[in-house]
Amino acid sequence: MIPGEIITKSTEVEINNHHPETVIEVENTGDRPIQVGSHFHFYEANAALDFEREMAYGKHLDIPAGAAVRFEPGDKKEVQLVEYAGKRKIFGFRGMVNGPIDESRVYRPTDENDEYAGVYGDNGDENVNKKGGKRS
């Protein structure tokens, strides 16, 4: 063994295992690239990013710690989000929460095993898929 050496299993490391995912489509409507880091409260991401913000409340990107997703101007892509764990308190970012997560606002699919979760938008005609994103 070498001092400071970390010996890991030869299998892949799973991150956010057993955390329900929410997939949303995001578009950069701004004129500059936007990068969002792994632990950033996605609900509070740059206002030039167009997406269903309420579905991102209490969640961050499902990517390795220290990584980020970059959105070039006009880019449209799907991202996968997971809920914050631990004490579930959010401070800083854009100052929109600054305290405990309001659990009543956190979107959760109703049944991960169904083909569709049966969750509808405010007007009742906006179907979403089991991962929480809009159906096309």
From Swiss-Prot:
Membrane spanning residue stretches: none
Source species, domain of life: Bacteria
Enzyme superclass (EC): hydrolase
Subunit structure: Heterotrimer of UreA (gamma), UreB (beta) and UreC (alpha) subunits. Three heterotrimers associate to form the active enzyme.
PANTHER family, per database record: UREASE (PTHR33569:SF1)
Family: Belongs to the urease beta subunit family.
Name this polypeptide is given: Urease subunit beta
Species annotation: Staphylococcus aureus (strain bovine RF122 / ET3-1)
Upper taxonomic lineage: Bacteria, Bacillati, Bacillota, Bacilli, Bacillales
